[in-house]
């Protein structure tokens, strides 16, 4: 994806619309109507219009003046403005080219570089060290994007608005109802904190689900997780309510090898995959020769 700054699109800084924040459905409708636009459901365009929540997200993101921030899907630019106005250098990835004139208007005078294209095509590995992600993520690609953030060595944190169900999975611990692969892989890379829930009415148009803000902090002093172990965890937790033994059998391991590994590690033969902590899964993987 080639950077495409909006410098030539932006009006004079004095024209930045500070006096008319987009904090109501009426304001959003008026702005969209002025440009002949409507929200596109297929792109997950539910625009956040609650000023208190926007400020809370920016605050939780923790970007200091001069730090690099990456935003996915700036939409109308309201969160972008909140973060950039605090002195951060914001790069925003936007897929919907129809929003060019809108962002030219709402981001006037701010230190923001908009890159036009699909966020799934962006080279996250090239981000500078210390980059923080602060974004209202498109819900239909949340999992893919979270994985990209985790794997990008320059990204130190991601403060993101996601579906509440996804947030519950991210913060879940082994043995809890929502624990699964996403919970485990997030723990492999660092830690997750629930910031706050966000009601449907904070968006225009309102989504079908409740949302939550979470912050993921990535410990870049750790070595990158072994891909073989990540794949093992994925398969082990794919049917998390089944016994770990059954899941391992579906992975192609022999019953004898599995029984020996579980016995040696003090794990019950009927233990469920969701009840085994990462350290236990790593020990099982080592016993089965998946990792060293």
Curated annotation (Swiss-Prot):
Metal-binding in keyword set: no
Keyword entries, A-Z: Cytoplasm, Methyltransferase, RNA-binding, rRNA processing, S-adenosyl-L-methionine, Transferase
GO annotations of cellular component type: cytosol
EC top class named in words: transferase
InterPro entries given in the database record: KsgA/Erm (IPR001737), rRNA_Ade_diMease-like_C (IPR023165), rRNA_Ade_Mease_Trfase_CS (IPR020596), rRNA_Ade_methylase_Trfase_N (IPR020598), rRNA_adenine_dimethylase (IPR011530), SAM-dependent_MTases_sf (IPR029063)
Cystine pairings recorded for this chain: none
Domain of life: Bacteria
SUPFAM superfamilies: S-adenosyl-L-methionine-dependent methyltransferases
Similarity annotation: Belongs to the class I-like SAM-binding methyltransferase superfamily. rRNA adenine N(6)-methyltransferase family. RsmA subfamily.
Protein's recorded name: Ribosomal RNA small subunit methyltransferase A
Species this protein is from: Deinococcus radiodurans (strain ATCC 13939 / DSM 20539 / JCM 16871 / CCUG 27074 / LMG 4051 / NBRC 15346 / NCIMB 9279 / VKM B-1422 / R1)
């Amino acid at each position: 994806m080639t950077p495409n700054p909006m410098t030539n699109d932006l009006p004079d800084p004095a024209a930045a619309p500070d006096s008319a924040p987009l904090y109501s459905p009426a304001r959003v409708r008026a702005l969209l109507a002025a440009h002949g636009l409507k929200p596109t459901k297929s792109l997950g365009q539910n625009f956040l219009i609650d000023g208190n929540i926007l400020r809370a997200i920016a605050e939780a993101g923790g970007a200091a003046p001069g730090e690099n921030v990456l935003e996915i899907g700036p939409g109308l630019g309201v969160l972008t403005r909140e973060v950039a106005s605090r002195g951060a250098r914001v790069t925003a990835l936007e897929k919907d080219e129809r929003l060019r004139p809108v962002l030219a208007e709402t981001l006037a005078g701010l230190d923001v570089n908009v890159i036009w294209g699909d966020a799934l095509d962006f080279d996250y590995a090239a981000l500078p060290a210390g980059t923080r992600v602060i974004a209202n993520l498109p819900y239909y690609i949340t999992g893919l994007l979270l994985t990209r953030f985790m794997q990008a060595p320059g990204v130190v944190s991601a403060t993101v608005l996601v579906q509440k169900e996804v947030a519950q999975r991210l913060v879940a611990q082994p043995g809890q109802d929502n624990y699964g692969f996403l919970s485990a892989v997030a723990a492999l890379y660092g830690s997750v904190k629930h910031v706050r829930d966000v009601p449907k009415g904070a968006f225009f148009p309102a989504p079908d689900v409740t949302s939550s803000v979470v912050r993921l902090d990535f410990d870049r002093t750790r070595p990158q997780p072994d891909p073989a172990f990540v794949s093992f965890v994925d398969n082990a937790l794919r049917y998390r309510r089944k016994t770990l033994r059954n899941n391992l059998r579906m992975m192609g391991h022999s019953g004898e090898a599995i029984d020996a590994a579980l016995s040696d590690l003090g794990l019950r033969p009927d233990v469920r995959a969701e009840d085994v902590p990462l350290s236990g899964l790593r020990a099982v993987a080592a016993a089965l020769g998946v990792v060293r």
